[in-house]
Amino acid sequence: MLGSPCLLWLLAVTFLVPRAQPLAPQDFEEEEADETETAWPPLPAVPCDYDHCRHLQVPCKELQRVGPAACLCPGLSSPAQPPDPPRMGEVRIAAEEGRAVVHWCAPFSPVLHYWLLLWDGSEAAQKGPPLNATVRRAELKGLKPGGIYVVCVVAANEAGASRVPQAGGEGLEGADIPAFGPCSRLAVPPNPRTLVHAAVGVGTALALLSCAALVWHFCLRDRWGCPRRAAARAAGAL
């Protein structure tokens, strides 16, 4: 009699507890299909925020490493070849201070550093100091008012340096300089202060000449008398 309640309890648990059903292969395929449908598509790669004309521009490879998402860099030539020539940009001349600010754009080549070449009418060019690869702007000092110069920017890497136009017998003054090449002609205007001083000097000289002419005229008049009065006296005597 004591075993009857236990037997009834076992029978109730056996029939009331739901039995686990084995998963069929079709169920696994449905789960995999659901996961595939909910997967996000890969984001399209966008160009990196790189401007080859921007001053102090961070290299594009560094932008790819630190960026929040993948980006694309412009194609570059082989580092085993010398860089292509940079492209000269805007040149601002300050005649009063005797200086000029030169701007350029980097070539699509690996570059380690830049430097400037300046011709002032002589065959030998003045070479500036090396500039960092992120630099796109440099300053020229000591320019003479009214002078004509030719400035070129050179890019260099381990394989060599970029090309510049060939200099003629008088430097680059008579060379054919392309419009979008690495060189540009600088025509420094005369210093405005020099023009003012020259105008004041010319005006002073004219004033002195006028005064000298008047003094000379009155001296001759006092010495020889007025020609008109002498003619009038002669006519009256007749």
From Swiss-Prot:
SUPFAM superfamilies to which the protein is assigned, alphabetical: Fibronectin type III
InterPro entries: FN3_dom, FN3_sf, Ig-like_fold
Record-linked Gene3D superfamilies: Immunoglobulins
Glycosylation (residues): N132
Domain annotation Fibronectin type-III: ranges: 82-176
Chain segments annotated as transmembrane: 195-215
Topology within the bilayer: Single-pass type I membrane protein
One GO cellular component term noted in the UniProt record for this chain: membrane
Protein's cellular compartments: Membrane
Signal peptide stretch: 1-22
Entry keyword set: Glycoprotein, Membrane, Signal, Transmembrane, Transmembrane helix
PROSITE patterns linked to this entry: FN3
Topological domain ranges for the Extracellular compartment: 23-194
Positions on the Cytoplasmic side per record topology: 216-238
Domain of life where this protein originates: Eukaryota
Entry protein name: LRRN4 C-terminal-like protein
Organism whose genome encodes this protein: Homo sapiens
